[in-house]
Regions:
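Short, solvent-exposed, mixed-charge loop/turn linkers that connect secondary-structure elements
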Residues: 68-71, 88-90, 109-159, 300, ...
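Transmembrane beta-barrel architecture of outer-membrane proteins
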Residues: 3-5, 51, 96, 153, ...
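Short loop-to-helix capping motifs
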Residues: 13, 48, 128, 155, ...
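Repeat-solenoid scaffold signature
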Residues: 85-116, 317
């Protein structure tokens, strides 16, 4: 007589002390910490793209005002040559104006080279073929404006949307659940064991009977021989939890410092831009007066050139300051985790961060 069996065995652990639930929550929080790390990378990439974009607009604006100044100097040089040929003035102003024009024209190739390299960097950051977005970047070369009111009244709660803080919170929550699961290992485990299948009996090569086989019963497992190892693991998990708490505090303090510095830089550079704007206006008035004095024979042409250089220098400083102001704003938003809109996180995970051990 021969017997044969075919069936399925199953075991279901009754999670009385929350061991399996704690493990599941720990895995969920660890996943969300990884998602926050990924979001942090996205914020850094977006900020770098914005900074490169603003650098491009600053260079383009510098090129525009330099080319504009070249045209003005060329017109002035033509007028000076006419006056020289008429005997009104001598050769000195002609040479001075020619020298100044050549100096200004020499700056254009460097600006164009920097513009090309910045466009290439933007192509890399946006994942496009070099040259593909150049036409788009040349359509509107004006500098973006910055609203100074965004530096006022930043809510403290905005810090919690920083991905590094969110990741630190999720890791604390995950470690709390791991500690909870480790403590549950000291408790007995209750489970139900079940099996279902078919059993056959045969004699002489002929199947004589086929019957159903069903079995179910409870079981209990006690940590008798490995209790010492479990207690060691509990100690390890508890120490890790303290490490994550210390890391969280360090992350928060770092975030507060970064936001404070970003706000200070942005607000002070805005004040600097306003002062430089006034400086440009004063330099333009001084240039007009110098030109009038030269036309009246009250001063030489060198004073006109000095005044014109001051205008160009003031305009460049103003453009660079506006670019720096925008860069400060980008860094401010980066320090806030990409803005004031909180990252979309699972609502249940928020409750998990306050779960008890």
């Amino acid at each position: 007589v021969e017997t044969g069996k075919l069936g399925i065995d199953a075991r279901w652990e009754i999670d009385i002390f929350g061991r399996q639930k704690a493990k599941s929550r720990a895995a969920s929080n660890s996943l969300q910490a990884s998602q926050a790390d990924l979001y942090s990378t996205w914020v850094s990439l977006s900020a770098e793209t914005a900074l490169q974009y603003m650098s491009l607009r600053t260079l383009q604006e510098q090129l525009r005002i330099t080319e504009d100044d070249v045209k003005r100097q060329q017109e002035a040089l033509e007028l000076i040559k006419i006056n020289n040929q008429s005997g009104i003035i001598n050769e000195l102003p002609v040479q001075q104006a020619t020298y100044a024009l050549s100096q200004t024209q020499a700056e254009i190739p460097s600006l164009k080279k920097n513009i090309a390299s910045t466009m290439a960097a933007l192509s890399i950051l946006t994942g496009t073929v070099p040259g593909e977005i150049d036409g788009l970047l040349m359509e509107n070369t004006s500098l973006p404006t910055v609203n100074p009111h965004i530096f006022i009244g930043i809510p403290a709660e905005a810090l919690r949307q920083r991905p590094d803080i969110q990741a630190a919170e999720r890791r604390i929550a995950a470690q709390q659940q791991k500690t909870k699961a480790a403590k549950a290992d000291l408790k007995p485990r209750f489970s139900l064991n079940g099996s279902i299948g078919l059993e056959s009996f045969s004699s002489g090569g002929l199947i004589s009977a086929i019957g159903k086989m069903i079995g179910i019963g409870p079981s209990i497992t006690m940590p008798i021989f490995n209790a010492g190892a479990i207690r060691k693991n509990i100690k390890v998990q508890t120490e890790k939890e303290q490490e994550y708490l210390a890391l969280y505090e360090e992350t928060v303090l770092k975030a507060v410092g970064e936001v404070r510095n970003a706000v200070t830089d942005a607000s002070q550079d805005h004040i600097k831009s306003e002062e430089l704007k006034s400086a440009v206006e004063s330099a333009q008035q001084a240039e007009s007066l110098a030109q009038t004095n030269f036309d009246s024979g009250l001063s030489d042409y060198l004073s006109v050139l000095d005044a014109r250089r001051n205008v160009l220098s003031a305009r460049r400083q103003y453009i660079m300051s506006r670019g720096q102001e925008f860069a400060d704003t980008v860094r401010l938003f980066k320090s806030l985790g990409g803005g004031w809109e909180a990252m979309d996180m699972d609502q249940e995970a928020e409750a998990d961060s306050h779960a008890k051990k």
